[in-house]
């Protein structure tokens, strides 16, 4: 429950830790579903997730607190009105400072439905990116997915020649014992209430990414809130 970043009558935003799946998979094990009862905060029903985050991606995850709230959030996501910003540390990096990746994506094979590949016949997929800092063969990117395909940011970065650091599927990281996927859902902005300003929520950089994010030039606050100097 300490991971709750925002709460009101309709919505929760939590800081999902890396390594925790959102939904149960065929292998079983611990998932976010096991913790939803602790996030009811007095309501009779458990909240439900309004979108996906990969198991190894950390950061902002939006939940609706009851059926009407979930329907409202689903509508906002369907209309592409929720602004999502990710931070990623990539190997190498783009030559420019900002741009777009417009590459259609499709499942890699029928038996690995959640592994994706670039495919001109696939679903249109668009990512906007901006370089925030660079250091020794690494680049910190701000990524904004305009579409929301499975593994979109990971495949788009890999196909552009700069895979996300710590990615064991699309990058160069080993399956076990790597540095951890350096992809973080940094912020969400949700126009939940028509007559009020959008709700903006930010998740702190996770521990496994702090060293390389700071090396790329970002002045991160220390856990007690002070800057690094």
Where are these regions (language model features)?
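Glycine-biased, low-complexity coil/linker segments
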Residues: 225-227
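Short histidine-centered loop motifs in beta-beta connectors
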Residues: 136-144
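Phosphate/ribose-recognition catalytic cores of enzymes acting on nucleotide-derived substrates
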Residues: 157-200
């Amino acid at each position: 429950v300490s991971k709750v970043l925002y709460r009101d009558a309709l919505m929760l935003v939590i800081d999902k830790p890396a390594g925790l799946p959102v939904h149960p998979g065929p292998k079983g094990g611990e998932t976010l579903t096991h913790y939803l009862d602790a996030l009811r905060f007095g309501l009779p029903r458990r909240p439900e997730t309004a979108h996906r985050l990969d198991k190894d991606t950390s950061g902002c995850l939006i939940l609706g607190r009851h059926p009407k709230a979930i329907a409202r959030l689903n509508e906002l996501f369907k209309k592409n009105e929720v602004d999502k910003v990710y931070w990623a540390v990539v190997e190498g990096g783009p030559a420019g400072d900002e741009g777009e990746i417009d590459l259609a994506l499709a499942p890699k094979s029928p038996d690995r439905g959640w592994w994706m590949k670039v495919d001109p016949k696939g679903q249109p997929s668009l990512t906007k990116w901006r370089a925030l800092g660079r250091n020794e063969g690494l680049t910190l990117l701000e990524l904004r997915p305009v579409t929301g395909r499975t593994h979109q940011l990971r495949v788009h970065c890999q196909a552009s020649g700069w895979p996300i650091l710590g990615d064991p599927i699309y990058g160069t990281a080993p399956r076990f014992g790597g540095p951890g996927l350096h992809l973080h859902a940094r912020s969400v902005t949700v126009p939940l209430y028509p007559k009020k300003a959008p709700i903006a929520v930010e998740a702190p950089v996770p521990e496994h990414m702090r060293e390389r994010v700071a090396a790329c030039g970002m002045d991160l606050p220390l856990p007690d809130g002070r800057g690094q100097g």
